[in-house]
UniProtKB/Swiss-Prot annotation:
GO biological process entries: translation
InterPro entries in alphabetical order: Ribosomal_uS10, Ribosomal_uS10_CS, Ribosomal_uS10_dom, Ribosomal_uS10_dom_sf
A GO CC term assigned to this protein in UniProt: ribosome
Stated name of the protein: Small ribosomal subunit protein uS10
Gene3D superfamilies found in the cross-reference section: Ribosomal protein S10 domain
HAMAP family: Ribosomal_uS10
Domain of life, source organism: Bacteria
UniProt xrefs under SMART domains: Ribosomal_S10
PANTHER family: 30S RIBOSOMAL PROTEIN S10 FAMILY MEMBER
């Protein structure tokens, strides 16, 4: 008999939001009797952009911007019906992208 597993992947630009959301998910799952593995921090994806400061000349003068995408991964082993219902009702911040695989 194969056990069920819910894999949750969180993605956000702000690490404080993603850590707070991961903590809420872990507490909710443990309160309903499920076993949680994680949250596992995945490598942060850094996108860098170089933009010319001047609209006409001075190509050597540039501004550099970056966007950091933080990722967390967690597995919920043997979830009960109460666990799934509690996770569906959970209200997470708007800046966190949640991806769930069964």
């Amino acid at each position: 008999m194969q056990s069920q597993k819910i894999r949750i992947r969180l993605k956000a630009f702000d690490y404080r939001l993603i850590d707070k959301s991961a903590l809420e998910i872990v507490e909710t799952a443990k309160r309903t009797g499920a076993v949680v593995k994680g949250p596992v921090p995945l490598p942060t994806r850094i996108e860098r952009f170089d933009v010319l400061r001047s609209p006409h000349v001075n190509k050597t003068s540039r501004d550099q911007f970056e966007i950091r995408t933080h990722l967390r991964l967690m597995d919920i082993m043997d979830p009960t019906d109460k666990t799934v219902d509690a996770l569906m009702k959970l209200d997470l911040p708007a800046g966190v992208d949640v991806e769930i695989k069964l």
